[in-house]
């Protein structure tokens, strides 16, 4: 009987040893493929509190000669897609897309990113947000899908999870977020005599004209 109990205990210990990896699934901060290193990062220098805006983002580091796509991919391609799972009282905005570069593929003109790019997303902390009593962190989960191309294109995806302290500062990637936000398309200052409400915006290689009235 004692030997049987010992055997059962050993079996239970073996099962428990494998439990964390199985229970946590595949979600993590970094996903690496042969073509891209993708990382979920955050910027919350003042912590997390109702009324605040916290920034998160997917940072893609491409292998040489590989690229992913902008929101307007051009003649071909598909933009990176982000699907968030957030705590109650936290809502995600749209990607604040930085300006892309023109990537010619044969006779096609595409718009996307090479090297390293950060796709920032604002999280709004609404009055409905309740501070977690036990952990002191909020958990941000992301399922992302991207099309990475050289000459051929390969669809890839990853599941990410990141904890952000409610109190305290998360600012390790401050410079990367600032650079990405600075690289957004800028509105051109209105010319003298322009109709109020009219605007001109440079978006990639396109000039968008909005005329009021």
Regions found by a protein language model. Give the residues of each.
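N-terminal secretory signal peptides that target proteins for export/translocation
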Residues: 1-4
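Bacterial N-terminal signal peptides
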Residues: 6-18
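Extracellular/lumen-exposed scaffold segments
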Residues: 20-213
């Amino acid at each position: 009987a004692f030997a049987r109990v010992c055997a059962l205990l050993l079996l239970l210990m073996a099962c428990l040893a494998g439990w964390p990896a199985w229970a946590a699934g595949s979600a993590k901060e970094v996903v690496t493929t042969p073509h891209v290193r993708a990382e979920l990062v955050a910027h919350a220098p003042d912590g997390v509190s109702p009324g605040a805006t916290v920034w998160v983002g997917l940072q893609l580091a491409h292998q040489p000669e590989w690229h992913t796509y902008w929101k307007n991919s051009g003649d071909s391609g598909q933009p990176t897609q982000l699907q968030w799972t957030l705590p109650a009282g936290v809502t995600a905005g749209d990607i604040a897309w930085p300006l892309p570069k023109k990537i010619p593929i044969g006779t096609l003109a595409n718009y996307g990113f090479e090297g390293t790019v950060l796709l920032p997303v604002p999280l709004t902390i609404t009055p409905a947000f309740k501070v977690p009593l036990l952990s002191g962190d909020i958990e941000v989960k992301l399922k992302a899908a991207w099309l990475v191309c050289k000459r051929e294109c390969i669809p890839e995806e990853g599941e990410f999870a990141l904890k952000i302290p409610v109190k305290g500062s998360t600012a390790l990637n401050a410079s990367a977020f600032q650079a990405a936000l600075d690289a957004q398309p800028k509105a051109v200052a209105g010319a003298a005599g322009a109709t109020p409400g009219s605007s001109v915006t440079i978006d990639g290689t396109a000039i968008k004209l909005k005329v009021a009235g």
